[in-house]
Amino acid sequence: SYIKDVYLIRDRLMAQDDVMIMQIKDYIEMPKENGYRSLHMVIRVPVYFMNKKQLVPVELQIRTLAMDLWASLEHDIKYKCLYQTETENFSEELKECSRLIYEAEEKMEIMNRTLEA
């Protein structure tokens, strides 16, 4: 998946007449301090019961495979650091990894656009 696909999914959800957008947080354009990137949306979707329909809030975290890989590995590293007495502070290294992954994604997306043209 490419970065543009994240926004395509967002746009398609926004076009749905039965989905209500409550909140959008774009951590791709504005990454979190630790380097985390993702598009978060809180939406209300219809859930059908026997006698009624109810709009239920749902949080979506939409990201590319590379963003998901970074988030999973970052979580694993932070979790392990909680239980070790002598650990290095990896925050700068994690941010750098996030930046490098994002740059690679951008390059891959440019190559894909060139091939699609």
Where are the model-predicted features located?
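Eukaryotic low-complexity, non-globular regulatory regions
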Residues: 109-117
